[in-house]
């Protein structure tokens, strides 16, 4: 078995044509603000930027082919502007993260990670940190199951649309 990073469905198909081992992982950038994988499915038939399919329906493809998506840069803003946690660019999202974090008695980092883990695609998180406490906060997300309402509230608070 092996995995790839940032591959679209047709790239995966082409690669699988020439290798014997099954491809089981695709690493992609994914966070609450950087969630085009979800947006293009939510905004189908809408005249919005999120409706544009930039990845060839990668989320659906991976789910249909039992390929695990691994989210890299799970706390990153779009355009590599840094971490969205505590950023002035996402006041509504950070406020909502704080409210939900207080409910579960965890950090906003934990809730941001739990948001990724709550998606039915059973995504995994790839993160790097030199902070033991931050790593513990991320690991704590495995014990939190956000409600659907909380998941969508965070999605909307990041500026995404629903039909």
Language model region names:
Residues 1-163:
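Beta/alpha (TIM)-barrel catalytic core signal, keyed to glycine-rich beta->alpha loops juxtaposed to Asp/Glu
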């Amino acid at each position: 078995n092996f995995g790839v990073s940032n591959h679209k469905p047709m790239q995966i198909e082409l690669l699988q044509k020439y290798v014997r081992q099954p491809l089981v992982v695709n690493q992609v950038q994914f966070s609450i603000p950087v969630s085009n994988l979800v947006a293009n499915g939510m905004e189908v038939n809408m005249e919005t930027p999120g409706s544009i399919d930039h990845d060839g329906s990668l989320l659906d493809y991976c789910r249909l082919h039992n390929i695990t998506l691994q989210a890299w840069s799970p706390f990153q803003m779009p355009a590599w502007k840094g971490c969205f946690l505590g950023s002035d660019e996402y006041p509504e999202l950070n406020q909502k993260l704080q409210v939900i974090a207080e409910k579960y008695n965890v950090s906003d980092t934990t809730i941001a990670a739990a948001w990724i883990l709550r998606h039915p695609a059973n995504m995994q998180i790839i993160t790097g940190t030199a902070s033991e406490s931050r790593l513990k906060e991320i690991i704590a997300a495995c014990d939190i199951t956000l409600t659907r309402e909380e998941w969508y509230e965070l999605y909307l608070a990041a500026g995404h649309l629903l039909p």
